């Protein structure tokens, strides 16, 4: 509930997200992201203020995930940050799990090990196997170790 006690609601109100959605006639979308900052999951990014990084925008009329490019466009329009996009390729170039695990390694600007990477098609592809759009997370094994 918007009781101004939730850090997420405070962020949404401060950044006028609801108003921006209405101003841009985007009341038919759902925006999903990662909320980060002080007091949240050890604040691995070492942020001084809460921040929200968008990773999915869904059209609620069709219940379909929007493409990477449409998501970027909406985030720019609304003044929202997206999760960092490290790589965009037309073809999936990784040949095996070891290559993916190596690609998932890395550190945040804070010096902490990053959690890993998420791999998705540029245009959402529905999978009957998982009953939803394809998406795969590859964890950084170094992240799983105690720091």
Predicted ranges, named:
Residues 1-147:
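Core nucleotide-handling region used for phosphoryl-transfer chemistry
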């Amino acid at each position: 509930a918007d009781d101004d006690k939730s850090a997420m609601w405070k962020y949404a109100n401060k950044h006028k997200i609801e108003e921006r959605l209405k101003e841009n006639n985007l009341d038919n979308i759902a925006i999903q992201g990662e909320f980060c900052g002080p007091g949240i999951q050890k604040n691995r990014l070492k942020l001084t203020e809460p921040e929200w990084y968008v990773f999915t925008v869904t059209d609620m009329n069709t219940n379909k995930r929007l493409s990477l490019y449409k998501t970027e466009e909406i985030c720019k329009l609304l003044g929202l940050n997206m999760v960092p996009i490290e790589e965009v390729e037309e073809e999936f170039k990784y040949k095996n799990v070891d290559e993916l695990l190596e690609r998932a390694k890395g550190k945040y600007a804070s010096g902490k090990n990053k959690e890993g990477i998420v791999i998705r098609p540029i245009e959402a592809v529905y999978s009957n196997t998982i009953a939803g759009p394809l998406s795969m997370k590859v964890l950084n094994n170094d992240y799983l170790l105690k720091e």
